[in-house]
Every structure is written in C-alpha cells, then in structure tokens.
Amino acid sequence: MGSEMCIRDSFYSYNLFMHVPDGFMNVTMSAATGVISFGTLWAYIRSAKDLIADKFIALTGMMSALIFVLQMINFPIAAGTSGHLLGGALAVIVLGPRLGLICLSVVVIIQSLLFADGGLSALGVNVLNMAIVTSATSWFIVKYWIKFIGKNKTSIVSVSVLAGILSVVFSSIAFTIQYAIGGT
C-alpha cells in the first residue's frame, strides 16, 4: 500500500495527494533524490541490456500495465486517508531486480506526468521511495529468506507476502527520513 498524505484546505475538507507532491520537499532534497533515482535508473537500464529480448519486453510492458492499473484502485485506511498497492514485490519477483525497478520507475513517471500524482520536482523522491526502495527490499527478502526456509509453493507465497509488506514499511521509513531532513 502506498500511503496518502492529507492536507486540509480552507474549507476544512481533506484533499488527498497520492505520492509526494511538488513543494513537499526542499530543493536540496528534491535534487539529491533526483540524482540518486535517475542515476540508479540509468545504471539499471544499461545493465539490463542483456535481458532485453522480445519475451522480456512484452512481460515488462504487461507488468507495468498491471501495476499501473492496480495502483489506480484506492481503498480507505483511516481518518480521511486511503492507500493503494505499490507492486514492487510483484514486479521484482516476476521480472527480477533490474527489470522490476525499471518497470516501477516507468509507472511512477507516467503517473507523475499524465495524472499529476506527485510532481516533477518530487519525481526523484517518488521514484526512490516507490521503485528503488521497494525493489531493493523485496529482492533482498526474496533472495535471502528463501534460502533459510526452502523453495516450495508455501514458502514462496509466504516470502512474497512478507516482501510486499516489508517493502511498504521500508518505503515509509525512507520517506520519513527524507521528510525529516528536507521537508518544507
């Protein structure tokens, strides 16, 4: 689930913003996370050249479309907020860490540009939190925990669920640290 941020407007109603909106982080934090996010994305794109084949391109495109649609479905959490699935664990488990990160980054960038989910100045923050942190967390959990509990259907499902849950937790922690350092 991606967390929603509530900001009260002058009529005391709640406006919900998915992702981190423009102006929520200072310029330094926005620039730093932009460099980190797009530097990482560029490195992953260059390293994924060996994976680019017809079947991987189609699968990556379908996974991006699926995650895009799943992120459009919001459900209430509490106190005027709602959440949606992030899809990081799903993308990484199906596509691997490199294509999974690229897939999630494409989804976040399209949402920012076409639907104003977040904004251009906050794009680095959103890519870092929703693509890089969720991908890294999911891949680490799946790769290393499966060694301890074995590879069968039950263990793969349980590790996948754990990866999905913990990727959201670590993404939230990353946002909290970023906001503590560079929030406005």
What are these regions (language model features)?
Residues 11-90:
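Hydrophobic transmembrane alpha-helices
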Residues 1-7:
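Short, small-residue-biased leader/transition segments that mark boundaries at the very start
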Residues 23, 27, 48-57, 97, ...:
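Hydrophobic, aromatic-rich alpha-helical transmembrane segments
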Residues 173-184:
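Membrane-helix interface motif
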Residues 71-134:
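Alpha-helical membrane segments and adjacent membrane-interface helices in multi-pass membrane proteins
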Residues 31-32, 57-62, 86, 101-105, ...:
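Hydrophobic alpha-helical transmembrane segments
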Residues 32-39, 62, 66-69, 106, ...:
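Lipid-exposed faces of alpha-helical membrane segments in multi-pass integral membrane proteins
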Residues 130-175:
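Short helix-perturbing small/polar motifs within transmembrane alpha-helices
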